[in-house]
Amino acid sequence: MKLHELKPAEGSRKVRNRVGRGIGSGNGKTAGKGHKGQNARSGGGVRPGFEGGQNPLYRRLPKRGFTNPTRKEFAVVNLEKLNRFEDGTEVSPELLLETGVVSNAKDGIKILGNGKLEKKLTVKANKFSASAVEAIEAAGGKTEVI
């Protein structure tokens, strides 16, 4: 094989389809837009969700729910992430932020019981799941709600 015999891989190069450039191209005259009407015009077309004047789906269905203005969002930490600390460490939200376990404390920290805890720790957080409290105390540690 020589340099002048190199060819691009099959299907790697697609020729751009130039519409409205002669009837022989197969996309001349109306350029694939059909005859007249809203969709044939420049900038034409209907907005998303428009159903031709029929009452659209988003208006046929009833409204549901509301946005709770006092919603609290907690940063979640699983037990397995706490194994990085030494035995006897007091794990506080400040320590979790410092060590990068959580990047944003949001409205507080909630400890969940996913994974296995092998260290004896004193954990301070805003919320605990029941399984997390059980696992921390089983490992000989303490939980403290702040």
From Swiss-Prot:
The keyword rRNA-binding applies. InterPro entries: Ribosomal_uL15 (IPR030878), Ribosomal_uL15/eL18 (IPR021131), Ribosomal_uL15/eL18_sf (IPR036227), Ribosomal_uL15_bac-type (IPR005749), Ribosomal_uL15_CS (IPR001196). HAMAP family: Ribosomal_uL15. Part of the 50S ribosomal subunit. Residues 1-65 are annotated as: Disordered. One of its GO terms (molecular function) is structural constituent of ribosome. Keywords: Ribonucleoprotein, Ribosomal protein, RNA-binding, rRNA-binding. It comes from the Bacteria. One of its GO terms (cellular component) is cytosolic large ribosomal subunit. This is Large ribosomal subunit protein uL15. Belongs to the universal ribosomal protein uL15 family. PANTHER family: 50S RIBOSOMAL PROTEIN L15, LARGE RIBOSOMAL SUBUNIT PROTEIN UL15M. NCBIfam families: rplO_bact. Residues 1-13 have a biased composition (Basic and acidic residues).
